Amino acid sequence: MQVLHVCSEMFPLLKTGGLADVLGALPAAQIAEGIDTRVLLPAFPDIRRGIPDAQVVSRRDTFAGRITLLFGHYNGVGIYLIDAPHLYDRPGSPYHDTNLFAYTDNVLRFALLGWVGAEMATGLDPFWRPDIVHAHDWHAGLAPAYLAARGHPAKSVFTVHNLAYQGMYYAHHMNEIDLPWSFYNMHGLEFNGQISFLKAGLYYADHITAVSPTYAREITEPEFGYGMEGLLRQRQREGRLTGILNGVDEKIWNPETDLLLASRFSRDSVEDKAENKRQLQVAMGLKVNDKVPLFAVVSRLTSQKGLDLVLEALPGLLEQGGQLALLGAGDPVLQEGFLAAAAEHPGQVGVQIGYHEAFSHRLMGGSDVILVPSRFEPCGLTQLYGLKYGTLPLVRRTGGLADTVSDTSLENLADGIATGFAFEDSNAWSLLRAIRRAFVLWSRPSLWRFVQRQAMAMDFSWHVAAQSYRDLYQRLKS
């Protein structure tokens, strides 16, 4: 079986969010399952530099100008690159300029990505063509539409990583993207009087996946559906919507082998985690004290991630003697709020604005609780890293957070399945009650260790997801 992933970023070549982490790990896991898997990416500068051995496969004149299709390898995975310097050779973000304005030609840049994905199924590479074209998020959303326009030369899967981003463009661009105008209607890619790349993926794909079972249910409801819930309910009734949890790349996130940690540890030597905590406290300007729980945040600072709730609940956390270490960037108001808290509570609150992949490992390895209070979270990887590192996740019960973290209720403790702390409502009071439960568990060290070991025993490796996708592909092919 031959599978082509169509996407806009891939860790570690280029990353702006969790999408890149998925594409950095899933293809290799599928190859290990015996699937001939390759990836198609735009040749953004960082990606092009990361695959210097890429060779020319073919050249083509397209609606978006002359392109060259290249093929190379990265970490054992075959990578196709769309080399179109007039579209992709721009520094910084792949999506917007230095003033944070979306590029005005994004409609062409990402239509081309979907177009090449579909052309691969008709022989753009004469020596390899996919049975399944697997498109990810709105950037690749037109791939299933182009496949439909070509008579479905391959089956298509469309994965929703975040339904909030919809790839909306004015209708007149239909004249520029090489799709028939008949596709521009309610039963097609039209949405609120515009072209929606996301809706194209949802409407034309043979099967839709979301990145967790709970998120797959949530997006059929108005609260999380962003206007697409009617179509998604229809796909659910047709058996064409599935939730498959993301995994953890254990080559990168594994406390037993993580060279970014001061002290490596395992489920059977969790006491060795203590040195990581000491060094993290020093690095963040916190009082060195192994007797108090250290809460951590590694996140974009946005209200979607619930970071305003953390700021509101912070006095209660500090009054109980806890510490907070935060790594992240985003909303300037939230940034200022956390910096002010650090200035007001030296030794108790440490803040680093920005994002550093290496330091995020030290934070995960050294803290006791990782806070993920998102208002919505399609899957979430942070809580999975927390489980892996014995850093108990404290999460809001939504999306993938609900699927992966079992609260320390009395029943779950008795059944030996508790792995963290979960709260229901998006408010500081609900968050504070969960924080209080964390302090209660912390006061019982043997019970804390028991929950830690249970958390570290959870298997969210990519091979589980790879098997689920393989089963889906086989159903589509049969």
From Swiss-Prot:
The keyword Transmembrane does not apply. Disulfide bonds: none annotated. Pathway: Glycan biosynthesis; glycogen biosynthesis. The keyword Transferase applies. Gene3D superfamilies: Glycogen Phosphorylase B. One of its GO terms (cellular component) is cytosol. Synthesizes alpha-1,4-glucan chains using ADP-glucose. Belongs to the glycosyltransferase 1 family. Bacterial/plant glycogen synthase subfamily. This is Glycogen synthase. It comes from Enterobacter sp. (strain 638).
